């Protein structure tokens, strides 16, 4: 059946940069409807191609979509179709467009299309003139796409759109990669590089050989903060004190002169070390939403707090991520851990409390109460322990809850515990971990006796030789003064954020010892030295250690009045507020009976149950 045809007058010729010479006489054309649509950007059905695309079509090879046969054709338009060949609009086609720099001969045009074309201009000369007019810097190369966009690259010089011809595969110049790229050309546009006029070449402030030519005065190159070594050193000294001389601990490395510029100034969470220590101190500002605690909520649980117990939730443990609950350990390893539990449950000293985890036998948590006569008196010091798979051939791993404070040469502010028994410090063979002989109980007792002692300054190797000398004792006293201030801060840190399963113990402990701590601070404010035995100790005038420094006395008084006293009041400690001066004798008895000198028989009875 003959297709329906319509006789249409020839439309006026559109302006074009090149003139086509039809192969037939200029007579009214008789075309079908599909041919008419073709002239307006439609799909060609034969060898004819729409006039908008300058008589060029793209040949798809065998790697085109599998849904179409070799004779199927489809086309996609693009905004680039509105422009003519580069002469019509010099900026319409970017010089960085990879399709605009493909030079191929045009000798087969007359064979592929049904109309004749005038002689094509010399592509090389045309683009050479175009490049010369753009004032491109010497040595700059135009980026080229690795995978060509089509089989006949000369067809993409102006339109950036893809049209299929009648499936003629006569051209063998297209690579297989071109077919791969053509599959996706109908779904997305080929990315076009940034035009040269948008790049600030030959401008001041541009970094030479920069990939993106960012000006040096751009905000991206400005340091996010000003770092001064003096300020950084002061910030570290405030939070890492006390410290032994630099010959032992080493001086903190000097900060960089500025930022690398990789992060913008206002990137969330981006802080320097100095800013982190200044803005996030261990002692956080008081929370106005906190309310005064009722001692009845925790005091009873504190009095019957077991010395050793097995609990469930290990989520806040420092080494919680080192293993899983489903991990299967060897029978020998599990048996050894159970032996450690039995030893701890039976032989723990009075001032050490331990919690094990039922679902994670490799984890342990312990708290040590600071002994009287030391700068650590009445404080609580928490440690997280991890038993590796190689235990007991290798020692356990211990982390101290420092809160960012370094209270001892062997307890780093990062949480590291420096001890020969743990393999974190050198020592003779008898001081190191001995497999199948050393125990976790030895580790805890060593921390209590060797680290949290009366004169922690002499914990550093070599410093003990200065003990007894005027210089050594003077330096040790200054170190102990700083240690006690940090111990007070650790108390506040623990009261505000006690570790899980130790909340009632921490509240009850500081409730019972609050008056003793305040009494000791009053003695220190009057000149007593740290570690001075307040309970039953002689007066300050009879203290053989001499007077404490003026700075220490001032620091103690300031911290107690501004921080510590308020924390004790929020804890519910009695007798610290003016309205509590008049109390009944029964209330006084309850407060006094809950001090640190709890009944030893009651503690042992609970532990043995």
From Swiss-Prot:
Annotated active site: 418 (glycyl thioester intermediate)
Q: Which residues form a coiled coil?
A: none
The EC number(s) attached to this protein equal 2.3.2.23
The family database entries (Pfam families) matched by this protein are listed as: UQ_con
Q: Which domain of life is it from?
A: Eukaryota
Quote the tissue specificity entry.
Expressed in seeds, pistils, siliques, hypocotyls and leaves.
Q: Has keyword Ubl conjugation? A: no
Name one molecular function that GO assigns to this entry: ubiquitin conjugating enzyme activity
Which keywords does the record carry?
A: ATP-binding, Nucleotide-binding, Transferase, Ubl conjugation pathway
Where is the region Disordered?
A: 70-99, 151-185
Mention one GO biological process in which this protein takes part, according to its record: protein ubiquitination
**Which intervals hold domain UBC core?**
332-492
Q: Where is the composition biased (Low complexity)?
A: 156-178
* SMART domains in alphabetical order: UBCc
Task: Cite the InterPro entries for this sequence.
Answer: UBQ-conjugat_E2_core, UBQ-conjugating_enzyme/RWD
Pathway, per UniProt? Protein modification; protein ubiquitination
Reaction equation(s) it catalyzes: S-ubiquitinyl-[E1 ubiquitin-activating enzyme]-L-cysteine + [E2 ubiquitin-conjugating enzyme]-L-cysteine = [E1 ubiquitin-activating enzyme]-L-cysteine + S-ubiquitinyl-[E2 ubiquitin-conjugating enzyme]-L-cysteine
> What this chain does, per the record?
Accepts the ubiquitin from the E1 complex and catalyzes its covalent attachment to other proteins.
The entry sums up its family as follows:
Belongs to the ubiquitin-conjugating enzyme family.
Q: What is this protein called?
A: Probable ubiquitin-conjugating enzyme E2 25
Q: What is the lineage of its organism?
A: Eukaryota, Viridiplantae, Streptophyta, Embryophyta, Tracheophyta
């Amino acid at each position: 059946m003959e297709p329906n045809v319509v006789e249409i007058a020839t439309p006026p010729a559109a302006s074009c940069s090149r003139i086509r010479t039809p192969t037939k006489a200029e007579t009214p054309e008789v075309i079908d409807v599909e041919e008419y649509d073709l002239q307006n950007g439609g799909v060609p059905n034969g060898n004819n191609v729409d006039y908008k695309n300058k008589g060029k079509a793209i040949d798809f090879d065998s790697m085109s979509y599998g849904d179409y046969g070799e004779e199927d054709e489809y086309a996609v338009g693009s905004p680039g179709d509105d422009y003519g060949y580069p002469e019509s609009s010099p900026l319409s086609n970017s010089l960085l467009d990879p399709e605009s720099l493909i030079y191929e001969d045009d000798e087969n045009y007359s064979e592929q299309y049904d109309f004749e074309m005038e002689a094509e201009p010399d592509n090389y000369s045309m683009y050479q003139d175009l490049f010369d007019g753009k004032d491109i810097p010497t040595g700059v190369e135009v980026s080229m796409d690795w995978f060509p966009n089509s089989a006949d690259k000369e067809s993409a010089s102006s339109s950036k759109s893809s049209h299929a011809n009648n499936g003629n595969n006569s051209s063998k110049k297209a690579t297989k990669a071109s077919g791969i790229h053509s599959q996706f050309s109908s779904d997305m546009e080929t990315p076009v590089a940034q035009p040269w006029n948008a790049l600030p070449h030959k401008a001041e402030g541009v970094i030479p050989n920069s990939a993106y030519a960012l000006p040096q005065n751009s905000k991206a190159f400005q340091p996010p903060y000003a770092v001064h070594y003096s300020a950084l050193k002061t910030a570290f000294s405030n939070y890492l004190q006390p410290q032994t001389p630099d010959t032992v601990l080493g001086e903190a490395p000097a900060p960089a002169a500025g930022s690398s510029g990789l992060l913008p100034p206002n990137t969330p969470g981006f802080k320097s070390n100095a800013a982190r220590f200044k803005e996030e101190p261990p002692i956080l500002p008081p929370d106005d939403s906190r309310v005064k605690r009722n001692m009845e909520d925790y005091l009873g649980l504190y009095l019957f707090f077991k010395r050793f117990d097995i609990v469930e939730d290990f989520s806040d443990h420092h080494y919680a991520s080192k293993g899983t609950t489903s991990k299967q350990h060897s029978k020998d390893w599990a048996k050894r851990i159970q032996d450690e539990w039995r030893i701890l449950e039976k032989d723990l000293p009075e001032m050490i409390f331990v919690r094990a985890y039922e679902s994670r036998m490799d984890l342990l948590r312990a708290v040590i109460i600071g002994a009287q006569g030391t700068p650590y008196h009445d404080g609580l010091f928490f440690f997280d322990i991890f038993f590796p798979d190689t235990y007991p051939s290798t020692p356990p791993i211990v982390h101290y809850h420092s809160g960012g404070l370094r209270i001892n040469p062997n307890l780093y502010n990062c949480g590291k515990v420096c001890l020969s028994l743990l393999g974190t410090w050198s020592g003779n063979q008898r001081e190191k971990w001995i497999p199948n002989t050393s125990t976790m109980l030895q580790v805890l007792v060593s921390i209590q006796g060797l680290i949290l002692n009366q004169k922690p300054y002499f914990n550093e190797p070599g410093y003990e030789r200065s003990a007894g000398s005027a210089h050594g004792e003077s330096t040790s006293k200054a170190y102990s003064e700083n240690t006690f201030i940090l111990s007070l801060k650790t108390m506040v840190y623990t009261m505000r954020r006690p570790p899980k399963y130790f909340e009632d113990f921490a509240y009850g402990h500081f409730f019972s010892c609050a008056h003793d701590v305040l009494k000791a601070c009053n003695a220190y404010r009057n000149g007593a030295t740290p570690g001075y035995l307040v309970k039953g100790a002689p007066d300050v005038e009879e203290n053989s250690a001499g007077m404490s420094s003026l700075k220490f006395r001032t620091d103690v008084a300031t911290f107690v009045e501004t921080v510590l006293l308020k924390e004790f009041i929020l804890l519910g400690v009695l007798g610290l507020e003016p309205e509590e001066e008049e109390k009944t004798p029964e209330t006084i008895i309850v407060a006094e009976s809950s001090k640190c000198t709890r009944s030893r028989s009651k503690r042992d009875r609970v532990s043995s149950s």
